[in-house]
């Protein structure tokens, strides 16, 4: 058997997330159904993925690995998958990797982009189901200052949905926003970390946009970030604006070491003031109705729109 890396892109609108669920359409479910069929295998082909995206979240740079027979014809595999998979999911490449490669644990970082329209934007009806509205005008200098204050190794419990036994300690490597030079004036918030907790990116963006729109202060964000439990005041942004863009990996020689490091559960003992980028310890609504996204409950064409927690 050989380990193969799959690079995958999908529009998450009509998927109940990545992970297989009974009686739900998921990305993992579709791929694990069709891969053995197109390869004419009589055994299952379980996939391990870099990021288990939630319902409605998109991906351009998702990565998974799977163990398959040595003689797989990758060109034929890609061609057959393109015929049987629906247009909202594409396997963009398949290539052999060392047996030490683990799509989840070997990853150095994941990069997500959240796309927004504020009141300074001109919404585009063609892309409206991949961009989320936010109330007010966003001061991007303020947003970037707030994002910088969160960088480093820390407990992101305030921004994560609790999962029993899971750590919420992460290293945030990059968090910045820019307004695109496009007709819409779309705002892109880039968030990159070694790993993410459940709903962490959408919660971070919700908190940052609250500060950037003037509805919350930097002191509020500092107090939220210092909390060791979920903050109810933080808005979880809709899934439709979020896309997994890229996953970074080390060289082949460092794959095993990185996987072992990632499997080690981190604790608060790993967190120090210097990691947080400061010499001093940190002391402890609903969106506006958007003309293109306003539909009576149950009539919105985006299947997951009304499932999002909006406040």
Please report, for each region that a protein language model flagged, where it lies by residue.
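Structured-RNA-binding interfaces characteristic of tRNA pseudouridine synthases
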Residues: 1-277, 288
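Intrinsically disordered, low-complexity segments enriched in serine/threonine/proline/glycine
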Residues: 277-284, 290-291, 302-303
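Short, intrinsically disordered C-terminal tails of secreted or membrane-associated proteins
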Residues: 293, 297-310
């Amino acid at each position: 058997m050989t380990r193969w890396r799959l690079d995958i892109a999908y529009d998450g609108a009509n998927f109940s997330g990545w992970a297989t669920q009974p009686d739900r359409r998921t990305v993992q479910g579709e791929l694990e159904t069709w891969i053995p069929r197109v390869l004419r295998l009589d055994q299952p082909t379980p996939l391990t993925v870099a990021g288990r995206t939630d319902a409605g979240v998109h991906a351009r740079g998702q990565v998974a690995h799977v163990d398959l027979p040595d003689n797989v014809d990758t060109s034929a595999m890609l061609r057959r998958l393109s015929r049987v998979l629906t247009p909202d999911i594409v396997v963009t490449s398949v290539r052999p990797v060392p047996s030490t490669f683990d799509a989840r644990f070997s990853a150095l970082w994941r990069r997500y982009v959240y796309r927004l329209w504020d009141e300074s934007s001109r919404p585009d009806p063609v892309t409206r189901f991949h961009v989320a509205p936010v109330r007010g005008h966003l001061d991007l200098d303020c947003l970037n200052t707030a994002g910088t204050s969160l960088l480093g190794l820390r407990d992101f419990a305030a921004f994560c949905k609790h999962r029993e036994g899971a750590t919420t300690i992460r290293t945030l490597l990059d968090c910045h926003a820019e307004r695109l030079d496009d007709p819409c004036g779309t705002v892109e918030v880039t968030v990159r970390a070694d790993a993410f907790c459940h709903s962490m990116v959408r919660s971070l963006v919700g908190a940052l946009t609250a500060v950037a729109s003037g509805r919350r202060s930097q002191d509020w964000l500092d107090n939220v970030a210092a909390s060791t439990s979920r903050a109810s005041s933080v808005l979880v942004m809709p899934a439709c604006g979020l896309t997994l863009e890229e996953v970074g990996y080390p060289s082949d020689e460092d794959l095993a070491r990185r996987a072992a490091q990632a499997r080690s559960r981190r604790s608060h003992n790993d967190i120090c003031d210097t990691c947080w980028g400061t010499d001093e310890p940190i002391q402890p609504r609903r969106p506006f109705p958007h003309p293109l996204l306003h539909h009576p409950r149950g009539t919105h064409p985006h299947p997951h729109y009304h499932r999002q927690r909006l406040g």
